[in-house]
Amino acid sequence: MKNPRKINLIVVHCSATRVNQDFPVEALEACHKARGFHSIGYHYYITKDGVVYPCRPETEVGAHARHYNAHSIGICYEGGLDEKGKPADTRTPAQKESLEDLLYSLALDYPDAEILGHRD
């Protein structure tokens, strides 16, 4: 099904959790609901074991990048902080592979979309 939303951004986020902390999709959902969202704000979540969880349908506006949600797809991977809580690339090989596969698929669906990180 073609997405009625005009997608020009694919935004990659991290959960901002420590490398030694488990943050399963259920914890992410509870966190987002506590913030007042009706569901997880991202369209996809990738856990440390590389499992990709579809969260919001791509046809639905996400809640992940203020002012950009209407025209973007949001992906989040579990982690992003080292053991001391400092920003770090904590992606596991499984996460990297899953993220690459997901981005490839989304780039086919949205060839004009720019892929960037949340801080970009």
Enumerate the language-model features and the residues they cover.
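Short, highly charged C-terminal tails/helix-capping segments
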Residues: L116-D120
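Active-site-adjacent loop/helix surface patches within enzyme catalytic domains
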Residues: M1-E114
